[in-house]
Amino acid sequence: MPQKKLLQKLLAGEDFSQEEMILCMNNIMDGLFSEMVIAALLALLQKKGVTPTETAGAYYSLMEKAVTIELDENAVDTCGTGGDHAGTFNISTTASIIANSAGVRIAKHGNRSVTSSCGSADVLEALGFTIDLPPEATKELFQESGFAFLFAPLYHPSMKRVAPVRRELGIRTIFNILGPLINPARAKRQLVGVFNRELMELYTEVLLQTGARRAMIVHAMTAEGIALDEPSLNGPTHIVEIHRGTVTEHTVYPEDFGLARHSLSEIQGGERDENARIIRQILDGSAPAAHRDAALFTTAMACYVSGKARCIDDGLDIAREALESGKSEKKFNEILKINAELSRKYRSVVN
């Protein structure tokens, strides 16, 4: 289908079939469409509203072109859409560190900041972690520690074709939705935070289509009326849970798990160095209660998604024990040491 027909279909407000979306995305990623055409397609898709079928089609196209890595399908990815503009510190990254120290295998897919002051790649780098290890080094790190960070540009090189267009457009597009879905390790267990409650249904359908084994899709609100793509410490957290094809929905509050309420301002972060300092304080036990509780709440959900915890309450106990025993700080320091050794090893091979 030529670009003109694709554009005409979107102008008429019609949805693409999965096959049409695969064709469209293949042409974009293979450089067969000009930047002007790509911009028009992305803007029209966004105006019409992206469907689960279109998202699944884009997923299949991008995963076909991705540099995939074989780790462990049962590893957990903690990844959010971003875009909530709440300015919280890197909670899901912190949770991945604590969960890993509790025995959860982590395959975290992430990138530098897009909508926030500090993305997962930025804060890990500030903590001393080499984010751009080659895949074979990342595999070694995972085998030794059960932790992997998958830096998106390394595994999705074709995405560089759309980066200038996305920057120039300056609006959310289908690519903002795709980020949490296109984990190059094909992780089948995911904790996904979304900035808009309407996206929960879309993610549910796409995760079911693409074979998620267990997933939690989370959207929350603060008492101040701010939307969050992570659990809330002072308002409702809406959850859609997927487990072997079965979908359940529920809403929880921090006090359901014995957590105190904290205002949004208490869990807001800043630039990469500030957020790295917050994570270090959480790990060494010197953090304020709000920072600690935000990390524990998300970690509890990651432990539950992994199957290590029977429920969120159980996950909270597991997370708290790992953190308060010093296990989390010790394990993360071990990860940093292995990461540095692998960075030196593979740099010397390249040189």
From Swiss-Prot:
Binds 2 magnesium ions per monomer. Mg(2+) 2 binds at residues 229-230. It catalyses: N-(5-phospho-beta-D-ribosyl)anthranilate + diphosphate = 5-phospho-alpha-D-ribose 1-diphosphate + anthranilate. GO terms for cellular component: cytosol. Its cofactor is Mg(2+). Mg(2+) 1 binds at residues 92, 230. Pathway: Amino-acid biosynthesis; L-tryptophan biosynthesis; L-tryptophan from chorismate: step 2/5. Anthranilate 1 binds at residues 80, 111. Anthranilate 2 binds at residue 166. Homodimer. This is Anthranilate phosphoribosyltransferase.
